């Protein structure tokens, strides 16, 4: 402990964009906005979007996307998209997340719900998971109160019996947490029914390094950065084997007896997180009674589908997600 009057020291520095000081103060740089602004917002004339608040106590907002071509006679499935950012960064308004949601809505002919959630280290885990539950509670409230008719003036019909959760990176971890909480029966939201989960480059961790983690850094991601995200987001004193980071850690609750809805795991073959995602899918499959599809895109890095939305691989990802949804409807 420093003496009185001693200036606080930088305990963690995350790319110069986020600093955690020794006295607990968190400093965030506005430069992150400058970085995200380098990605142009997509001008998609086929999708309407609007913002709404879903949790007033924490002032948390979400963004709704609806394809203009949607017919009032056709009920739209719901896709709840959780953005990535290592639990420390990210927002529904970041261009690549916004653009991806526009594409999800138009390609899947679905109503897309893209929420913000509390970020670490100001709000360490399980804050993000609690907010994810709040999103589904909000969705339930819309279903039972017919509030969906107020989302858009034309009163688009929404099928709450066909809800899908899609998560990117840390959002993929959130999707896993929701799948487990639903599967264990701790969340009951009838008439809202989650039919399946899509985990895209899910952010999982562990103390023992995998081969892909020991491989070369990616253009936008390094092992050091992943470790910092865990130190900043996990409860103080927790290791990467904590169950919120490692679903199969030495002290993690078993998933053997939990009934999980079908899951689709998508990962790039050159991702540092590839082996974590592959192990996750393999171990769930091995338990039996759990449907898990694993798709790996050769030579692709983390976030290839949102960072390069016009690529053939990104278009293929959308087709795979669409097929996954259609097979479960």
From Swiss-Prot:
Phenotype when the gene is knocked out: Normal shoot branching. Reduced hydrolysis of strigolactones (SLs).
Enzyme Commission identifier(s): 3.1.1.-
Main location: nucleus
Subcellular location(s) per record: Nucleus; Cytoplasm, Cytosol
Catalytic site positions: 169, 271, 302
UniProt keyword annotations, A-Z: Cytoplasm, Hydrolase, Nucleus, Serine esterase
Enzyme class, UniProt record, top EC level: hydrolase
A Pfam family reported for this protein in Swiss-Prot or TrEMBL: Abhydrolase_3
Alphabetical list of InterPro entries matching this protein: AB_hydrolase_3 (IPR013094), AB_hydrolase_fold (IPR029058), Carboxylest/Gibb_receptor (IPR050466)
Task performed by this protein: Binds to strigolactones (SLs) such as (-)-2'-epi-GR24(4DO), 5-deoxystrigol (5DS) and orobanchol, and catalyzes their hydrolysis; SL are phytohormones controlling shoot branching and communications between plants and microorganisms. Promotes shoot branching by dampening SL-inhibited axillary bud outgrowth.
Name of the molecule in the record: Strigolactones hydrolase CXE15
Organism: Arabidopsis thaliana (Mouse-ear cress)
């Amino acid at each position: 402990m420093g003496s009185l009057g001693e200036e606080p020291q930088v305990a963690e520095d995350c790319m110069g964009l986020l600093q955690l000081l020794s006295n607990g103060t968190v400093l965030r740089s506005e430069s992150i906005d400058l970085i995200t602004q380098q990605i142009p917002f997509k001008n998609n004339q086929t999708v309407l979007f609007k913002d709404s608040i879903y949790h007033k106590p924490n002032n948390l907002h979400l963004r709704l996307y609806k394809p203009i071509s949607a017919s009032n006679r056709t009920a739209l499935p719901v896709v709840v998209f959780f953005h990535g950012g290592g639990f420390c960064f990210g927002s529904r308004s970041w261009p690549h997340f916004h653009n991806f949601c526009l594409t999800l809505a138009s390609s899947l002919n679905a109503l897309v719900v893209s929420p913000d959630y509390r970020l670490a280290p100001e709000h360490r885990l399980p804050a993000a998971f609690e907010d994810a539950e709040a999103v589904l509670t909000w969705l339930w409230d819309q279903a039972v109160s017919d509030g969906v008719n107020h989302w858009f003036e034309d009163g688009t019909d929404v099928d709450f019996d066909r809800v899908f959760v899609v998560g990117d990176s840390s959002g993929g971890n959130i999707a896993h947490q929701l799948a487990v909480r639903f599967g264990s029966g701790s969340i009951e939201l009838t008439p809202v029914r989650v039919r399946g989960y899509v985990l895209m480059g899910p952010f999982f961790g562990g103390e023992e390094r995998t081969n892909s983690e020991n491989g070369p850094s990616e253009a936008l991601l390094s092992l050091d950065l992943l470790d910092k995200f865990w130190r900043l987001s996990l409860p103080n004193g927790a290791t990467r084997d904590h169950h919120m980071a490692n679903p199969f850690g030495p002290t993690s609750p078993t998933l053997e007896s939990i009934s999980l809805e079908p899951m689709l795991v998508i990962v790039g073959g050159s991702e540092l997180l590839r082996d974590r995602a592959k192990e996750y899918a393999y171990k769930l499959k091995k338990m039996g009674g759990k449907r898990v599809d694993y798709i790996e895109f050769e030579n692709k890095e983390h976030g290839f589908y949102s960072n390069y939305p016009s690529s053939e691989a990104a278009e293929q990802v959308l087709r795979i997600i669409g097929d996954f949804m259609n097979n479960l409807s």
